[in-house]
Regions:
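Short connector loops at secondary-structure junctions
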Residues: 182-202
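Gly/Ser-rich catalytic/binding loops embedded in alpha/beta enzyme cores
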Residues: 1-68, 179, 314
Length: 351
């Protein structure tokens, strides 16, 4: 049967061309999908097939989910735009279950405007996830509006980021500064400084929450496979999967409390025209298909559940690289307006 978002797309007249690939169960053996710009490189993951299909021009729009970095990272590698609205703004019924409070539904598209149109439609037609508010804002993309302040939130990932990517990111920020946008370092402001300090802990909290919330149905499937091997899953995914679900209730409660505090710190940074920015990945697509790349730049936003967009505004070594912007809870329209302004004003760098 269709997931809620696929059902809504069909009702809206979308032509569903087919299913796309992803790493086994979202975290195991990567799929055979290759990068549309270099077949010897990874498309990223876990929404690898969706990103590759959009990046190759096979489809204008595809859907995916993100628990850690599964939308914006593959979009970065494949030259697509990825829009992850806030957690729960789009119904995720039928997506396979697990990681209930970490998983976000999002859209990959050729343009930011298309990503908005589809995401906004899904939030209304499929509805928000039970207990959550849907996306606010116009059904069509909002008017472009240049951001006022962009805060670099790169502390956790900068030392992991290759020199060419650092140079491309700095050059884009220099261009934005020349256009009148204030560029600030996280350590210059109290709230962003606290966020930057807590990013490593955010990754740990994400892992604990994922482990605890994966007990069903993931662990059930893998225990059945272990008891009576059917060949349904690779040894890699069974071994790694059974290591999940070991988080204790106390550890889970601690991670949830950390997330609440992290969200409060993030919300304290809210200001008109202010957004956080990072590269979408630590470099261009990795060689081979066994490595889907680092999710370091998605740790904070995946834990907090705030809206994020990745725009293919940079290139390194002839390969696309995304520029990621983070907004605030309920601020999808504000984030999209800023993204559209950047996409229009800096299209020359678009891959």
């Amino acid at each position: 049967r269709d997931a809620a978002i696929v059902h809504a797309l069909r009702k809206g007249g979308a032509v569903i061309l087919g299913k796309t690939t992803l790493p086994e169960l979202g975290f195991g053996q990567p799929a055979a999908t290759t990068n549309p710009w270099d077949a010897g490189r990874s498309p990223g993951g876990s929404s690898s097939g969706s990103a590759a299909a959009v990046g190759a021009g096979m489809v204008p729009v595809a859907i995916g989910t993100q628990g850690k970095g599964s939308l914006t990272r593959p979009a970065s590698f494949c030259g697509a735009c990825a829009f992850k609205p806030g957690h729960g703004t789009i119904h995720r019924g039928g997506d396979g279950g697990g990681q209930e409070t970490n998983t976000h539904v999002g859209v990959l598209a050729h343009t930011a405007g298309d990503a908005w149109t589809v995401a906004r439609y899904l939030s209304e037609a499929a509805g928000s996830h039970p207990g959550h508010r849907g996306m606010e804002g116009p059904k069509e993309p909002p008017p472009a509006l240049m951001p006022k302040i962009l805060v670099r939130l790169t502390a956790a990932g900068w030392d992991r980021t290759d020199a060419a990517t650092q140079t491309a990111f700095d050059a884009l920020l220099d261009g934005l500064a020349g256009a009148g946008v204030t560029i600030a370092e996280a350590d210059e402001l109290p709230g962003p400084r606290a966020l930057a300090r807590d990013l490593e802990a955010a990754a740990q909290a994400l892992d604990v929450i994922a482990d605890y919330e994966s007990r069903w149905p993931l662990i059930m499937y893998l225990e059945q496979e272990n008891a009576a091997p059917t060949g349904a899953y690779s040894e890699r995914v069974v071994t790694r999967g059974l290591q999940r679900g070991r988080a204790t209730r106390a550890e889970y409660h601690e991670a949830l409390a950390f997330r609440d505090a992290f969200r409060a710190t993030l919300d304290s940074c809210r200001a008109d025209g202010l957004f956080f920015v990072t590269p979408s990945a630590t470099g261009p697509a990795p060689q081979g298909t066994g490595d889907t790349g680092s999710s370091v730049y998605q740790w904070g936003s995946s834990l907090a559940g705030n809206p994020v967009i990745s725009l293919p505004l940079m290139a390194v070594d002839g390969l696309p690289l995304g520029f990621e912007m983070q907004g605030f809870a309920g601020g999808e329209a504000d984030l999209m307006a800023a993204a559209l302004a950047l996409d229009e004003g800096f299209a020359a760098g678009r891959y």
